[in-house]
Amino acid sequence: MKELQERIVQDGKVLSASVLKVDAFLNHQVDPQLTMKIGQRFAELFAGENITKVVTIEASGIHFAMATSFALGVPFIYAKKKKAVTLTEEVYSAPVHSFTRQETYQISVSRQYLSKEDRVLIVDDFLATGAALVGLTNIVKDAGAHLVGVGAVIEKSFQEGRGLLEQAGVRIESLARIESMSPEGIHFIEEEPARV
């Protein structure tokens, strides 16, 4: 997605060869117009898949899941990192290690909202090590739901996340694939034509 790549170059900050800060427009201060375009693009990429739910993890994936679910006309669910006192029913859960926070969470989704009848699209802000997305795919599998695919807003293609998901047979669509990055610049893998 060209507009997203341009914003990453313009407003993103490379903190190291593996850390990209995009909080000026994606995951702290949020550009709502760009967010809605991202959701529309995911809806286009996964059109015809009869998706019934969009799933993400709190917090940085929520607005992308909302925009995508809005474009698809279906509900979205976000996995919680900590079990709330209001979450009294049974849950699906999986451990997830956060690269940026260096913490491991036990994410959970209520069994009430995810079932074997669902066709699920997972959406998140980053695909890097793949830990969050693998955790979410495990929850979808535990529910017996059909995983249609994963949509990542930004992919750090030089990290192992894509490989882990591909080994599991997961379809991945990333809107900005970064081949490499340094304070001197960001190199993208060029977009491939969308599947029809």
Swiss-Prot record:
Converts the preformed base xanthine, a product of nucleic acid breakdown, to xanthosine 5'-monophosphate (XMP), so it can be reused for RNA or DNA synthesis. Pfam families: Pribosyltran. Xanthine binds at residues 20, 27, 156. Pathway: Purine metabolism; XMP biosynthesis via salvage pathway; XMP from xanthine: step 1/1. Belongs to the purine/pyrimidine phosphoribosyltransferase family. Xpt subfamily. One of its GO terms (cellular component) is cytoplasm. It is found in: Cytoplasm. GO terms for biological process: purine ribonucleoside salvage; xanthine metabolic process; XMP salvage. GO terms for molecular function: xanthine phosphoribosyltransferase activity. Its EC number is 2.4.2.22. The keyword Isomerase does not apply. It catalyses: XMP + diphosphate = xanthine + 5-phospho-alpha-D-ribose 1-diphosphate. Homodimer. 5-phospho-alpha-D-ribose 1-diphosphate binds at residues 128-132. Its main location: cytoplasm. HAMAP family: XPRTase. Keywords: Cytoplasm, Glycosyltransferase, Purine salvage, Transferase. CDD domains: PRTases_typeI (cd06223). It comes from Brevibacillus brevis (strain 47 / JCM 6285 / NBRC 100599). It comes from the Bacteria. It is an enzyme of class 2 (transferase). This is Xanthine phosphoribosyltransferase.
